[in-house]
Every structure is written in structure tokens, then in C-alpha cells.
């Protein structure tokens, strides 16, 4: 029997439920958060926004983290990196990166999609050593944002292209983590690094000896985070390290890794990343003229995201398919592949994160970087969406098609 009270409510809220279980929801939330941050940062609340995130905390358990912005970027974002690490490990063991055939094209695309934007960036900023440090900013792709834009197109986009974009973004995240660890580590403290590696070894041992309960891993991971924080390596790397030690052994049909990923992914996508976005996307534009928008740094980042990403990824796909190195995504044509390549130029979360590491001593450069990131990501999103919207059709209207070498 249909409940006369719940049925109308259920129908009324059906669109809302559909939105939050769709690919688009996390991306739409990020767009709203970024817009809110910009509005607040340019309103009478700008002073309160600045004080909230950058004002000294009255008390902090770790003196090194003396404002809320640092706690978000070094602490809360470790959860995001932990989820990324879980996803990467699962994909490498039993997912879309588990065999050479499956990972060839995404790996090639991700490498080219990081290298070419970096080259474009350096080409624009030239020999300015202060700006060159930001070479990795346009090299990252925001999974939630890009998949969100793709989700707005519904079933018009072939499933193979969704899978390709997701896999490229995952490999991209691996590259970004390696870049952060290798190039954005300052004042390395060897003793703390040794301690961190020792704790990591303990977590590996816990896995090997069959520890399958979550709390031991969480407690040891917190100690690992503190050690990495004081080692000089960015603290969020502890999240990836901890994730790699979580067991993939299946009990009652699900592994601890899968349970953690399933449980934490929504919190990461709908709480952690939006908080990070709100804390980092706000730029006060008062006093900024056209010269600031057209300065070398924002232009270099925007060019890297809009031009470099699509040039690198689409170019390597064409080359790999023509040379017979890899197969293109099934049931997709070249224009659709190009459209998805453009969407990889959406670099919101990781790009903002890297900009904070690259220009730690200059709020001006960080603000200029934010303008380039937001502008480049917005252009990539609109351009990619428009091309795909105009060239794709619903499955029932779609003739069988594949790209030919």
C-alpha cells in the first residue's frame, strides 16, 4: 500500500535525490563553493573571511599549525589524499589499472597531460625563478569537477569515455602526489623522516600479519601524520602512505580497503573538498586591475590548463592509436575524445593545493594563481561541455562508431 504522506514527499524530493547520487553532484557543489568563496571574499564579510582562515588561533595542539587554513590544508586534506590512495591501490590491484593493456593509454595520457601543461607554463613565465616554482599547478585534473561536468551530459557520453576520464584523473593524482613529495618538500628533517618511514613499516607489518580492524590503522596513521608533518614532507603525503597499507583481503565479500573507501569517499567529496575549496578559492579583487588578471602567472596557469592539457592528452591519444600502441576508448569518435581531453583542464582542487605549496611566502602570487586556476578551469569546463553537448547524442540515436588508426 502506498503511504499517502510519504509518496508526495518522495516524488517532490526525487530530483534532489537524483542529483546527489549522480556524477554531477560533487562537481556542482564545488562550483557553488568556489562561487561562494569569491562572493564572500569581495563582500563586506571579506575581513571576517580572512580572519577566520588566516587569523592566529587562540590555542593549537601543534604550534606549526597556527591558523585554520593550515589545519585544513595540512590536516583535513590528509583525508582527501587517504581516499585517493585507497582508490589508487584498488585500481592497481583489481580495477582499471590492474593490467598493462588497461593502463597503457591512461598512463600515457596522464604523463603527457602533466608534461605539456608544465612546458606551456614555463614557456609563458620564462626565466622568472619565483614563478617557475609553480610549474606543476596546471598539471593536475580535478576528478570531482571534471566528472561533474561530464555527468551533466547524462547518457550522451559513452561509458568508455567516462571510464577513460576517471582513469586518467586517477593516474594524474598519482603523478601529483609524487610531484608534491619530490619537488615541494622544504627543510627536510632526517630524524623525523626516519621515524615516519619506521611507522609506515609498522603499518605494512600490520597488514602482513593479518590485522583487519580499522582502529589500529587509524591510531598509527595519526602518529604517521605527525611524523610526516615534522619531517618537512607535506603532511598530506601521510594519507597516501597510510592508504597503501590498508588490507585488500576480502572477508564476507568486502575488504577493509573497500569498506573504508565506500565509507569515506562521500565525506571527502561532500565535506573535506568543499571546505578546502571555500578556504582556498576566495580572492579579493579590490585593487586588482586588468594587469593583474593578465599577469604572467595567471596567464601561464590558464594556458597550461586550457591549451596544455588538451594538447598533451589528445595528442598522445592520437599518436598511440595511430602507432598501434593502444586502443582508443570504445564507441567514441575523435571529436568526443577531444572534448573529454579539454575537460581534463579542470584543475581546481589539486591545482589550488599545489599553488599554496609553490608560493608559500607570497599571498599576492597565491591570489594570482587562484585567478589563473579558476579562469582556466572555467574555460575548460565550458569549452569541453559545449563541444560534447553539440556533438554527442543519446544511445538510441547513436550509430556504432569507433576511431580508426
Swiss-Prot record:
<feature type="transmembrane region" description="Helical">
    <location>
        <begin position="263"/>
        <end position="283"/>
    </location>
</feature>
<comment type="similarity">
    <text>Belongs to the NhaA Na(+)/H(+) (TC 2.A.33) antiporter family.</text>
</comment>
<keyword id="KW-0739">Sodium transport</keyword>
<keyword id="KW-0050">Antiport</keyword>
<feature type="transmembrane region" description="Helical">
    <location>
        <begin position="334"/>
        <end position="354"/>
    </location>
</feature>
<feature type="transmembrane region" description="Helical">
    <location>
        <begin position="20"/>
        <end position="40"/>
    </location>
</feature>
<dbReference type="InterPro" id="IPR004670">
    <property type="entry name" value="NhaA"/>
</dbReference>
<dbReference type="GO" id="GO:0006885">
    <property type="term" value="P:regulation of pH"/>
</dbReference>
<dbReference type="InterPro" id="IPR023171">
    <property type="entry name" value="Na/H_antiporter_dom_sf"/>
</dbReference>
<keyword id="KW-0812">Transmembrane</keyword>
<feature type="transmembrane region" description="Helical">
    <location>
        <begin position="105"/>
        <end position="125"/>
    </location>
</feature>
<dbReference type="Pfam" id="PF06965">
    <property type="entry name" value="Na_H_antiport_1"/>
</dbReference>
<feature type="transmembrane region" description="Helical">
    <location>
        <begin position="163"/>
        <end position="183"/>
    </location>
</feature>
<feature type="transmembrane region" description="Helical">
    <location>
        <begin position="371"/>
        <end position="391"/>
    </location>
</feature>
<feature type="transmembrane region" description="Helical">
    <location>
        <begin position="134"/>
        <end position="154"/>
    </location>
</feature>
<keyword id="KW-0406">Ion transport</keyword>
<keyword id="KW-1003">Cell membrane</keyword>
<dbReference type="GO" id="GO:0005886">
    <property type="term" value="C:plasma membrane"/>
</dbReference>
<keyword id="KW-0472">Membrane</keyword>
<dbReference type="GO" id="GO:0015385">
    <property type="term" value="F:sodium:proton antiporter activity"/>
</dbReference>
<keyword id="KW-0997">Cell inner membrane</keyword>
<keyword id="KW-0813">Transport</keyword>
<feature type="transmembrane region" description="Helical">
    <location>
        <begin position="214"/>
        <end position="234"/>
    </location>
</feature>
<feature type="transmembrane region" description="Helical">
    <location>
        <begin position="301"/>
        <end position="321"/>
    </location>
</feature>
<keyword id="KW-1133">Transmembrane helix</keyword>
<protein>
    <recommendedName>
        <fullName>Na(+)/H(+) antiporter NhaA 1</fullName>
    </recommendedName>
</protein>
<comment type="function">
    <text>Na(+)/H(+) antiporter that extrudes sodium in exchange for external protons.</text>
</comment>
<keyword id="KW-0915">Sodium</keyword>
<feature type="transmembrane region" description="Helical">
    <location>
        <begin position="186"/>
        <end position="206"/>
    </location>
</feature>
<feature type="transmembrane region" description="Helical">
    <location>
        <begin position="68"/>
        <end position="88"/>
    </location>
</feature>
